[in-house]
Amino acid sequence: MDYFSESIKKAIRTVPDWPKPGVSFRDITTVLQDKTAFRKLIDAFVHRYHGQHIDAVAAVDARGFIIGSALAYELNASLVLVRKKGKLPFDTLVEDYELEYGTASVELHEDAFKPGDKVILVDDLIATGGTMLAATRLIRRIGAEIVEVAAMIDLPDLGGSRKLQEEGLQVYTVCSFEGD
């Protein structure tokens, strides 16, 4: 996967000191705007999951929707949206998670999966892992099987991937940015 990883990593714009001093923001819009880079990104995921008979791609609000919809289409899988609380119109399951200063919640329609469905959970980036971990709890409550948690970018210094692995989850990221 080095072919995909290096070219995608180079296409990601780093914005220093945004949204606050000391933060290096990883801007994925440059990947999305570059049709070759975006194709390579989706191909990286498709090559990984092709032939695994994935039933659904669960995509995390909001940038995960971009990657998740393209991946679901390519895998001939359904697309399930993991939304911020209050955004889904039908009966939902809700899971709270900790933020640096407070809590947040994600939700899922209670009929989003069938028990035993094979699911890939996708987002743009793994930082602390809180949102992804909350989403995995929702998916498991419905009885679906999480094949893997996947993202374009890993920020390993923030510990999210490690936290997800400690919960017994397989984690795949296309590229990572350490220490900066």
Curated annotation (Swiss-Prot):
Catalyzes a salvage reaction resulting in the formation of AMP, that is energically less costly than de novo synthesis. Homodimer. It comes from the Bacteria. It catalyses: AMP + diphosphate = 5-phospho-alpha-D-ribose 1-diphosphate + adenine. It comes from Marinobacter nauticus (strain ATCC 700491 / DSM 11845 / VT8) (Marinobacter aquaeolei). Belongs to the purine/pyrimidine phosphoribosyltransferase family. Transmembrane segments: none annotated. It is found in: Cytoplasm. One of its GO terms (cellular component) is cytoplasm. Pfam families: Pribosyltran. SUPFAM superfamilies: PRTase-like. This is Adenine phosphoribosyltransferase. GO terms for biological process: adenine salvage; AMP salvage; purine ribonucleoside salvage. PANTHER family: ADENINE PHOSPHORIBOSYLTRANSFERASE (PTHR11776), PHOSPHORIBOSYLTRANSFERASE DOMAIN-CONTAINING PROTEIN (PTHR11776:SF7).
